[in-house]
Protein backbone atom coordinates (compact mmCIF):
# COMPACT_ATOMS: atom_id res chain seq x y z
CA UNK A 1 0.00 0.00 0.00
CA UNK A 2 1.49 3.31 -1.03
CA UNK A 3 1.75 6.48 1.05
CA UNK A 4 -0.85 8.24 -1.16
CA UNK A 5 -3.58 5.76 -0.25
CA UNK A 6 -2.94 6.30 3.50
CA UNK A 7 -3.73 10.00 3.19
CA UNK A 8 -7.38 9.40 2.41
CA UNK A 9 -9.62 9.68 5.47
CA UNK A 10 -11.73 6.70 4.48
CA UNK A 11 -8.71 4.42 4.41
CA UNK A 12 -7.50 5.64 7.85
CA UNK A 13 -10.95 5.06 9.35
CA UNK A 14 -11.13 1.55 7.96
CA UNK A 15 -7.66 0.73 9.37
CA UNK A 16 -8.55 2.10 12.79
CA UNK A 17 -11.83 0.18 12.84
CA UNK A 18 -10.06 -3.06 12.02
CA UNK A 19 -7.54 -2.47 14.83
CA UNK A 20 -4.58 -2.81 12.50
CA UNK A 21 -2.73 0.14 14.09
CA UNK A 22 -1.46 -0.13 17.69
CA UNK A 23 -3.32 1.59 20.53
CA UNK A 24 -0.92 4.54 20.77
CA UNK A 25 -1.49 5.39 17.12
CA UNK A 26 -5.23 5.83 17.77
CA UNK A 27 -4.74 8.36 20.59
CA UNK A 28 -5.38 12.06 20.20
CA UNK A 29 -1.66 12.82 20.42
CA UNK A 30 -1.06 10.88 17.22
CA UNK A 31 -4.17 12.26 15.56
CA UNK A 32 -2.93 15.80 16.21
CA UNK A 33 -0.45 15.32 13.40
CA UNK A 34 -3.35 15.33 10.95
CA UNK A 35 -5.36 18.19 12.45
CA UNK A 36 -5.73 20.74 15.26
CA UNK A 37 -5.13 19.68 18.89
CA UNK A 38 -8.22 19.10 21.07
CA UNK A 39 -7.06 20.14 24.55
CA UNK A 40 -10.30 19.08 26.26
CA UNK A 41 -9.98 15.56 24.92
CA UNK A 42 -6.33 15.43 26.01
CA UNK A 43 -7.22 16.50 29.56
CA UNK A 44 -9.93 13.83 29.77
CA UNK A 45 -7.50 11.16 28.65
CA UNK A 46 -4.94 12.38 31.20
CA UNK A 47 -7.40 12.20 34.07
CA UNK A 48 -8.46 8.72 33.01
CA UNK A 49 -4.84 7.58 32.99
CA UNK A 50 -4.16 9.07 36.42
CA UNK A 51 -7.24 7.35 37.82
CA UNK A 52 -5.94 4.03 36.54
CA UNK A 53 -2.56 4.63 38.22
CA UNK A 54 -4.22 5.55 41.53
CA UNK A 55 -6.34 2.42 41.43
CA UNK A 56 -3.27 0.28 40.85
CA UNK A 57 -1.41 1.94 43.76
CA UNK A 58 -4.38 1.50 46.14
CA UNK A 59 -4.65 -2.19 45.34
CA UNK A 60 -0.92 -2.64 45.79
CA UNK A 61 -0.47 -0.74 49.09
CA UNK A 62 -3.99 -0.69 50.56
CA UNK A 63 -3.61 3.05 50.94
CA UNK A 64 -5.59 5.99 49.57
CA UNK A 65 -2.95 8.40 48.28
CA UNK A 66 -5.51 11.06 47.33
CA UNK A 67 -6.79 11.41 50.92
CA UNK A 68 -3.45 10.36 52.47
CA UNK A 69 -4.92 7.69 54.73
CA UNK A 70 -5.04 3.87 54.73
CA UNK A 71 -8.02 2.06 53.29
CA UNK A 72 -10.68 0.84 55.68
CA UNK A 73 -11.40 -2.80 56.15
CA UNK A 74 -9.11 -5.83 56.20
CA UNK A 75 -6.60 -5.95 53.44
CA UNK A 76 -3.29 -7.43 52.47
CA UNK A 77 -1.40 -4.74 54.44
CA UNK A 78 -2.22 -3.14 57.79
CA UNK A 79 -1.08 0.42 58.57
CA UNK A 80 -0.30 1.47 62.17
CA UNK A 81 0.53 4.97 63.44
CA UNK A 82 3.84 5.28 65.34
CA UNK A 83 5.86 8.08 66.89
CA UNK A 84 8.22 9.91 64.58
CA UNK A 85 11.17 9.36 66.95
CA UNK A 86 10.89 5.59 66.61
CA UNK A 87 11.24 5.80 62.84
CA UNK A 88 14.81 5.48 61.49
CA UNK A 89 16.51 8.69 60.40
CA UNK A 90 16.48 7.46 56.81
CA UNK A 91 12.68 7.73 56.71
CA UNK A 92 12.56 10.97 58.71
CA UNK A 93 14.68 12.87 56.19
CA UNK A 94 11.73 13.20 53.78
CA UNK A 95 7.99 13.48 54.18
CA UNK A 96 5.18 12.70 51.76
CA UNK A 97 2.79 15.58 51.16
CA UNK A 98 0.11 14.60 48.68
CA UNK A 99 1.91 13.31 45.63
CA UNK A 100 5.13 15.20 46.43
CA UNK A 101 7.87 14.12 48.80
CA UNK A 102 9.59 17.01 50.54
CA UNK A 103 12.97 17.02 52.21
CA UNK A 104 12.91 17.78 55.91
CA UNK A 105 15.40 20.34 57.23
CA UNK A 106 15.43 20.19 61.05
CA UNK A 107 18.65 22.15 61.40
CA UNK A 108 17.49 25.31 59.62
CA UNK A 109 14.32 25.27 61.72
CA UNK A 110 16.35 25.03 64.94
CA UNK A 111 18.58 27.90 63.85
CA UNK A 112 15.56 30.03 63.06
CA UNK A 113 14.14 29.34 66.52
CA UNK A 114 17.47 30.12 68.19
CA UNK A 115 17.87 33.38 66.30
CA UNK A 116 14.39 34.67 67.06
CA UNK A 117 14.76 34.83 70.91
CA UNK A 118 17.86 37.09 70.81
CA UNK A 119 15.83 39.65 68.88
CA UNK A 120 13.66 40.34 71.97
CA UNK A 121 16.61 41.08 74.32
CA UNK A 122 18.01 43.30 71.61
CA UNK A 123 14.79 45.28 71.67
CA UNK A 124 15.00 45.48 75.47
CA UNK A 125 18.58 46.70 75.25
CA UNK A 126 17.47 49.41 72.87
CA UNK A 127 14.90 50.46 75.42
CA UNK A 128 17.57 50.50 78.09
CA UNK A 129 19.77 52.69 75.92
CA UNK A 130 16.96 55.14 75.56
CA UNK A 131 16.61 55.27 79.34
CA UNK A 132 20.37 55.46 79.92
CA UNK A 133 20.72 59.16 78.99
CA UNK A 134 18.33 60.03 81.77
CA UNK A 135 20.53 58.27 84.37
CA UNK A 136 23.84 59.65 83.06
CA UNK A 137 23.90 62.74 85.31
CA UNK A 138 23.65 60.63 88.49
CA UNK A 139 26.10 57.89 87.40
CA UNK A 140 29.34 59.93 86.94
CA UNK A 141 29.27 61.16 90.55
CA UNK A 142 30.15 57.82 92.23
CA UNK A 143 32.38 56.69 89.36
CA UNK A 144 35.35 59.06 89.98
CA UNK A 145 35.31 58.29 93.69
CA UNK A 146 35.81 54.57 93.06
CA UNK A 147 38.48 54.83 90.34
CA UNK A 148 41.25 56.76 92.18
CA UNK A 149 41.72 54.27 95.09
CA UNK A 150 43.20 51.46 92.91
CA UNK A 151 45.70 53.86 91.32
CA UNK A 152 47.75 54.55 94.50
CA UNK A 153 47.65 50.87 95.38
CA UNK A 154 49.28 49.87 92.09
CA UNK A 155 51.86 52.69 92.07
CA UNK A 156 53.89 51.63 95.14
CA UNK A 157 54.16 48.08 93.84
CA UNK A 158 56.72 48.85 91.07
CA UNK A 159 58.63 51.26 93.34
CA UNK A 160 60.42 48.59 95.44
CA UNK A 161 61.86 46.94 92.32
CA UNK A 162 65.27 45.36 93.17
CA UNK A 163 66.73 46.37 89.80
CA UNK A 164 68.79 49.35 91.08
CA UNK A 165 70.19 47.27 93.94
CA UNK A 166 71.41 44.45 91.70
CA UNK A 167 73.10 46.75 89.18
CA UNK A 168 75.83 48.21 91.45
CA UNK A 169 76.59 44.84 92.98
CA UNK A 170 77.08 43.04 89.68
CA UNK A 171 79.22 45.75 88.07
CA UNK A 172 82.18 45.75 90.51
CA UNK A 173 82.28 41.97 90.65
CA UNK A 174 82.63 41.69 86.89
CA UNK A 175 85.39 44.32 86.79
CA UNK A 176 87.35 42.67 89.59
CA UNK A 177 87.32 39.33 87.84
CA UNK A 178 88.29 40.64 84.44
CA UNK A 179 91.10 42.93 85.67
CA UNK A 180 93.59 40.21 86.77
CA UNK A 181 92.96 38.22 83.60
CA UNK A 182 95.11 40.40 81.27
CA UNK A 183 98.08 40.16 83.70
CA UNK A 184 99.48 36.87 82.29
CA UNK A 185 99.75 38.46 78.83
CA UNK A 186 103.63 38.23 78.75
CA UNK A 187 103.32 34.45 78.74
CA UNK A 188 103.48 34.25 74.89
CA UNK A 189 107.04 35.67 74.95
CA UNK A 190 108.79 32.32 75.63
CA UNK A 191 106.84 30.73 72.78
CA UNK A 192 109.50 31.42 70.07
CA UNK A 193 112.21 29.70 72.18
CA UNK A 194 110.93 26.13 71.70
CA UNK A 195 110.46 26.80 67.98
CA UNK A 196 114.22 26.95 67.41
CA UNK A 197 114.83 23.67 69.26
CA UNK A 198 113.10 21.33 66.80
CA UNK A 199 114.91 22.95 63.84
CA UNK A 200 117.99 20.66 64.01
CA UNK A 201 115.76 17.61 64.22
CA UNK A 202 115.42 17.20 60.41
CA UNK A 203 119.20 16.68 60.13
CA UNK A 204 118.98 12.84 60.11
CA UNK A 205 117.02 13.05 56.85
CA UNK A 206 119.99 11.85 54.71
CA UNK A 207 119.83 8.51 56.55
CA UNK A 208 117.72 6.85 53.81
CA UNK A 209 120.55 7.40 51.30
CA UNK A 210 122.42 4.20 52.27
CA UNK A 211 119.32 2.19 51.33
CA UNK A 212 120.77 1.25 47.90
CA UNK A 213 123.51 -0.71 49.69
CA UNK A 214 122.10 -4.08 48.63
CA UNK A 215 123.15 -3.28 45.06
CA UNK A 216 126.66 -4.79 45.45
CA UNK A 217 125.15 -7.95 46.92
CA UNK A 218 122.91 -8.40 43.94
CA UNK A 219 125.82 -7.97 41.52
CA UNK A 220 127.25 -11.50 42.01
CA UNK A 221 123.78 -13.00 41.67
CA UNK A 222 123.14 -11.11 38.45
CA UNK A 223 126.50 -12.12 37.02
CA UNK A 224 125.85 -15.76 37.94
CA UNK A 225 122.43 -15.61 36.33
CA UNK A 226 123.87 -14.02 33.19
CA UNK A 227 126.40 -16.81 32.93
CA UNK A 228 123.70 -19.43 33.29
CA UNK A 229 121.60 -17.77 30.61
CA UNK A 230 124.55 -17.52 28.25
CA UNK A 231 125.30 -21.20 28.85
CA UNK A 232 121.76 -22.16 28.03
CA UNK A 233 121.83 -20.00 24.90
CA UNK A 234 125.02 -21.70 23.73
CA UNK A 235 123.49 -25.18 24.13
CA UNK A 236 120.39 -24.34 22.02
CA UNK A 237 120.35 -25.48 18.34
CA UNK A 238 121.29 -23.09 15.57
CA UNK A 239 117.76 -23.11 14.14
CA UNK A 240 116.42 -21.65 17.38
CA UNK A 241 119.02 -18.89 17.28
CA UNK A 242 118.01 -17.92 13.76
CA UNK A 243 114.36 -17.71 14.77
CA UNK A 244 114.97 -16.40 18.24
CA UNK A 245 112.31 -13.67 17.82
CA UNK A 246 109.51 -16.21 17.25
CA UNK A 247 107.44 -17.03 20.32
CA UNK A 248 106.91 -20.66 21.27
CA UNK A 249 106.36 -22.98 24.21
CA UNK A 250 109.43 -23.04 26.44
CA UNK A 251 110.55 -26.22 28.14
CA UNK A 252 109.65 -26.84 31.77
CA UNK A 253 113.16 -26.24 33.12
CA UNK A 254 113.77 -23.31 30.81
CA UNK A 255 110.50 -21.61 31.83
CA UNK A 256 111.38 -21.93 35.51
CA UNK A 257 114.88 -20.57 34.99
CA UNK A 258 113.67 -17.70 32.83
CA UNK A 259 111.00 -16.76 35.41
CA UNK A 260 113.59 -16.60 38.19
CA UNK A 261 116.01 -14.74 35.97
CA UNK A 262 113.38 -12.21 34.92
CA UNK A 263 112.72 -11.32 38.54
CA UNK A 264 116.42 -10.58 39.06
CA UNK A 265 117.09 -8.97 35.68
CA UNK A 266 114.47 -6.26 36.19
CA UNK A 267 117.18 -4.07 37.74
CA UNK A 268 120.03 -5.08 35.40
CA UNK A 269 121.10 -3.08 32.35
CA UNK A 270 123.76 -5.11 30.45
CA UNK A 271 121.22 -7.60 29.00
CA UNK A 272 119.50 -4.81 27.05
CA UNK A 273 122.56 -4.28 24.85
CA UNK A 274 122.89 -8.02 24.32
CA UNK A 275 119.24 -8.27 23.30
CA UNK A 276 119.44 -5.41 20.80
CA UNK A 277 122.53 -7.00 19.22
CA UNK A 278 120.62 -10.25 18.47
CA UNK A 279 117.33 -8.64 17.38
CA UNK A 280 118.25 -8.22 13.71
CA UNK A 281 115.56 -9.91 11.61
CA UNK A 282 114.36 -9.72 8.03
CA UNK A 283 110.89 -8.77 6.82
CA UNK A 284 109.61 -12.35 6.29
CA UNK A 285 110.84 -13.33 9.74
CA UNK A 286 108.82 -10.47 11.27
CA UNK A 287 105.67 -11.73 9.55
CA UNK A 288 106.30 -15.17 10.98
CA UNK A 289 106.78 -13.63 14.42
CA UNK A 290 103.23 -12.20 14.36
CA UNK A 291 101.83 -15.61 15.30
CA UNK A 292 100.03 -15.39 18.71
CA UNK A 293 101.76 -16.82 21.75
CA UNK A 294 99.53 -19.89 22.29
CA UNK A 295 100.07 -21.10 18.69
CA UNK A 296 103.43 -22.79 17.91
CA UNK A 297 105.69 -21.24 15.30
CA UNK A 298 105.42 -22.86 11.83
CA UNK A 299 109.22 -22.99 11.42
CA UNK A 300 110.22 -23.94 14.95
CA UNK A 301 110.39 -27.54 16.06
CA UNK A 302 107.45 -28.79 18.19
CA UNK A 303 108.02 -28.70 21.94
CA UNK A 304 110.98 -26.30 21.67
CA UNK A 305 110.48 -22.66 22.70
CA UNK A 306 112.56 -19.50 22.53
CA UNK A 307 114.51 -18.46 25.58
CA UNK A 308 114.33 -14.75 24.72
CA UNK A 309 110.53 -14.59 25.01
CA UNK A 310 110.63 -13.10 28.50
CA UNK A 311 113.21 -10.35 27.75
CA UNK A 312 111.21 -9.21 24.70
CA UNK A 313 108.04 -8.86 26.79
CA UNK A 314 109.93 -6.93 29.41
CA UNK A 315 111.27 -4.45 26.85
CA UNK A 316 107.83 -3.78 25.44
UniProtKB/Swiss-Prot annotation:
A Pfam family this chain is assigned to: CDI
Similarity section: Belongs to the CDI family.
Gene Ontology CC: cytoplasm; nucleus
Keyword Cell cycle applies: yes
Organism: Homo sapiens
Subunit-level organization: Interacts with PCNA.
Outcome, altering residue 158 to A: In BWS; uncertain significance
Listed name of the protein: Cyclin-dependent kinase inhibitor 1C
Gene: CDKN1C
Amino acid sequence: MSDASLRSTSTMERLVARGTFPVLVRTSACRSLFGPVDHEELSRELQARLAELNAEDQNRWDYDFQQDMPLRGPGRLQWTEVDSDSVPAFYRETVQVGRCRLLLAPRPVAVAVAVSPPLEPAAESLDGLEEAPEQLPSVPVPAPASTPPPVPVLAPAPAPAPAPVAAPVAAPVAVAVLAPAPAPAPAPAPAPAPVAAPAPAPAPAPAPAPAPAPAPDAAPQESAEQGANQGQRGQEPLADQLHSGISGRPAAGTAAASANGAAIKKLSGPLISDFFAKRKRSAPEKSSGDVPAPCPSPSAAPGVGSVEQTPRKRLR
